[in-house]
Amino acid sequence: MAARLCCQLDSARDVLLLRPFGPQSSGPSFPRPAAGSAASSASSPSPSDESDLPLGRLPACFASASGPCCLVFTCAELRTMDSTVNFVSWHANRQLGMPSKDLWTPYIKDQLLTKWEEGSIDPRLSIFVLGGCRHKCMRLL
């Protein structure tokens, strides 16, 4: 069975919480470095590598130019789990007018998280559940 994650942004601690969604929905949170925070040089990536940072423990297909696995990657608002939507289809509809599908990764990393942090994102994705796939997960930094 595919893993499901509940993703929430805790703006007070500047942490993106990724928790297993199910009977026991408690799990570790994975901190995302703040834009201006200073970290030790041994653990922080160089500025040139910053654009390649994975978003938590998401499947490798999530950052591909073609998007995540179409058949098993879904999202839904936590309160209305009966109305899940395919994340690739949802994103494709939002992407109409964008010149290239190669903008998938920058859109997710920059636009989606920026809107999320500013509180101006579509409420359907402010708290959402992502269905996993069979691809290997990207490693955490």
UniProtKB/Swiss-Prot annotation:
Chain residue ranges for the region called Disordered: 24-52
Signal peptide segment: none
UniProt key word tRNA processing: no
Protein's UniProt keywords contain Transcription regulation: yes
Oligomeric and partner information: May form homodimer. May interact with host CEBPA, CFLAR, CREB1, DDB1, E4F1, HBXIP, HSPD1/HSP60, NFKBIA, POLR2E and SMAD4. Interacts with host SMC5-SMC6 complex and induces its degradation. Interacts with host TRPC4AP; leading to prevent ubiquitination of TRPC4AP. Interacts with host PLSCR1; this interaction promotes ubiquitination and degradation of HBx and impairs HBx-mediated cell proliferation.
Family per record: Belongs to the orthohepadnavirus protein X family.
Name listed for the protein in its UniProt record: Protein X
Gene name per UniProt: X
